[in-house]
Amino acid sequence: MSYGDDYNNNDRGYGGGRGFGGGRGGRGGSRGGRGGFGGDRGFGGDRGGYGGGGYQDNDFGNLPKQDWDLEKLPQFEKNFYKEDPAVTERTDEEVTAFRKENQMTLHGDGIPKPVTNFDEAGFPPYVLKEVKQQGFEKPTAIQCQGWPMALTGRDVIGIASTGSGKTLSYCLPAIVHINAQPMLSHGDGPIVLVLAPTRELAVQIQQECSKFGKSSKIRNTCVYGGVPRGQQIRDLARGVEIVIATPGRLLDMLESGKTNLRRVTYLVLDEADRMLDMGFEPQIRKIVDQIRPDRQTLMWSATWPKEVQRLAHDYLKDQIQVNIGSLELSASHNITQVVEVCTEYEKRDRLVKHLETVMENKESKCLIFTGTKRVADDITKFLRQDGWPALAIHGDKQQQERDWVLNEFRQGKSPIMVATDVASRGIDVKGINFVINYDYPSNSEDYVHRIGRTGRAGTKGTAYTYFTEDNRKQARDLLVILREAKQHIDPKLEEMGGGRGGRGGWGGRGGRGGRGGRGGYRRGGYGGGGYGGGRGSDITGSNSAPLSNSRW
């Protein structure tokens, strides 16, 4: 049983029908019951003709391109926002001050005022109950402005850093949206589609949707590659209101006829910049072309490059936009950034030195980033042989093993995780105190996203970075980030960023120096070579390397 099975919702349905409080039927009379879709299904008889004018051939394999006829499409509701009296009474000056305090920049016409607490957001009682049961004290900045924007039914762009609460910004309005639509019939696809760049992020989004959809019995499934398709196909066949998917696997499901997007009226593109960075733009365009054009589209991103702007221009209409913080690349000020200029040969000694400090606190979690899968495996083996309980996660690991590694890290059973950039975004593990960039990434955007794994939700964190001569081209951009966050700067980095001088050295490898005491850190039951219950043949390569007793 893999860690991922804990929230796969294999029985999907939380019980029979949907109808909290008497079902989804009339909803205050505004929908007029389940009619509206015409006849028994309302999709024009044999479903194939939804949208009217047939299909056109394209270059998308077996996936036909829809030729939409808006006049024949059934109508649907998407504006559910009713401004709370407390929000209405706020003066323009008060609203401006609140937005300034929370570093909000707005673009577009008719943007609703922000809310300042959960009760003002206008969510139905069943949603508010779930929120309060989860222990949230107050909404984040992106939620304060994003919820009213999403609930109006407008197309929305939200630009905010990772860890800012974007998932709930679209998840809760999605639940309201679903409960205002006619229930699914046999053969229907989802009502809400969320596209995400990685399977890890997709699974985390599913967790949030599952938490807040229980009371209204909203079903969801997660569709991603790297695992057998069987369970995902069965979930889709049973019918789910929400599909969270990576573009490649969803496209495969669509082309093979395992699902359709004819019922989608609420589309979310999460971490749009990351999806484009990973080369998913063609797949995204193929998928979005399968969705009715009068849908509501919400695009969320940590950055706002031209490629993302172009995608928004092509697929969003009359959109409203909120940016939290500066659009200039910047790191969280909750993170202490320590950049050390060194040689490639010095990295391992520095890594051990920092781990000795980091792991003095037995509750610490440390995420180490490498530039390649090979280095991730090499470092993991080295650390385990040196007595550190490290595990690796990267694209060559099977999904079951990746899920297990994440769970071991999340629970603190293996408090050191070595990762490639597959984990640099979207993985939301609470309590990561330290990030170590063993290899500096190829660009400063990835640097910011990597170190953003710590210092989240108002907590403090520390990021150590090893910067070598090979990284010289990135020095200027890194200096901008460090100065903006008012961090101490290594004089050697200043020199590299100024472009002065040749490649001159800063000394050879030097001695290893003393490592300090070697014993002492033992967390109950971990030591030896055990894996807290043993995974047998599921664990491969570096993760199966024997663990010395010398350090933990």
Curated annotation (Swiss-Prot):
One Pfam family named in its UniProt record: Helicase_C
Catalysed reactions listed for this entry: ATP + H2O = ADP + phosphate + H(+)
DEAD box, short sequence motif: residues: 270-273
GO biological process, one term: alternative mRNA splicing, via spliceosome
Annotated ranges, domain Helicase C-terminal: 350-497
Binding-site list for ATP: 160-167
Stretches the record annotates as Disordered: 1-66, 493-552
Intracellular or extracellular location(s): Cytoplasm; Nucleus
Record InterPro entries: DEAD/DEAH_box_helicase_dom, Helicase_ATP-bd, Helicase_C-like, P-loop_NTPase, RNA-helicase_DEAD-box_CS, RNA_helicase_DEAD_Q_motif
Skewed-composition ranges (Polar residues): 539-552
Start-end of Low complexity biased regions: 1-12
Main location (coarse class): cytoplasm
Gene Ontology MF terms in the entry: ATP binding; ATP hydrolysis activity; mRNA binding; RNA helicase activity
Transmembrane regions listed in the UniProt entry: none
Alphabetized SMART domains for the sequence: DEXDc, HELICc
PROSITE patterns listed in its UniProt record: DEAD_ATP_HELICASE (PS00039), HELICASE_ATP_BIND_1 (PS51192), HELICASE_CTER (PS51194), Q_MOTIF (PS51195)
Domain Helicase ATP-binding residues, every copy: 147-322
Region (RNA-binding RGG-box): 506-535
Keyword terms, alphabetized: ATP-binding, Cytoplasm, Helicase, Hydrolase, Nonsense-mediated mRNA decay, Nucleotide-binding, Nucleus, Ribosome biogenesis, RNA-binding, rRNA processing
Gly residues bias: start-end ranges: 13-55, 498-536
EC number in record: 3.6.4.13
Motif position, Q motif: 116-144
Similarity-based family: Belongs to the DEAD box helicase family. DDX5/DBP2 subfamily.
Reported function: ATP-dependent RNA helicase involved nonsense-mediated mRNA decay and ribosome biogenesis through rRNA processing.
Subunit field text: Associates with polysomes.
Name listed for the protein in its UniProt record: ATP-dependent RNA helicase DBP2
